[in-house]
Amino acid sequence: MTEKHLSTQFEAELGAISGRVLEMGGLVESQVAQAVYALTNFNDETAAHVLQREGRVNQMEVEIDRDLSDIIARRQPTARDLRLLIAVSKTIANLERVGDEAARIARTVQRLINTGVSTRLRLPVADLSFEADLAIAQLRKALDAFARLDTAKALEVLKQDDQIDQEFDGLLRKLITYMMEDPRTISSSIDLIFVAKAIERVGDHAKNLAEAIIYVVKGTDVRHTSVEDVENVVR
């Protein structure tokens, strides 16, 4: 078999893996969106659907990881290709954790519904929806950057990460005020604080994806690096 033929096969295998990563990304993005919908509408059926699909997310991580190991064992990837394979491994781990956060939100919804909180108290769930919209947009942008290995778009994700953190801080203050003003809301407000934290972590995982993309293209590890320094790397 010629070297060119082997190279073409390898490129096809890399393309197939990247396609599976994007498929997994689309699934976890949908999981987060549905979990938040379940929360804002106190919809037990949607929450249950999210939990039913959690196993599929975990299965995809295992399958893609297995394929990665197989490629590394059979091929001799160049430095950049090896960086891509490493980045894919990190990416699917982050996506699996996003799926975990979606499941955590869904379980919280079921608990709130089962305790009757949704009918007894007026909770600030709409504020959580805005934070979630930001996090989902970040995740979508990071996946788009992954599909194109677009460092400029990855940099945008890093720049916008603080906005989600600020939303979380604002929600935390609001929920603390809720608890102080009405002790009946303490238990449910604590649940919503954990939901807000789960949403913030979705943004953190999107940031991790963006950093992995820059690592693939530029060969520089930009974790724990200021946005200003990352800009210099991307230029």
Where are these regions (language model features)?
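Cytosolic, long alpha-helical scaffolding segments
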Residues: 1-235
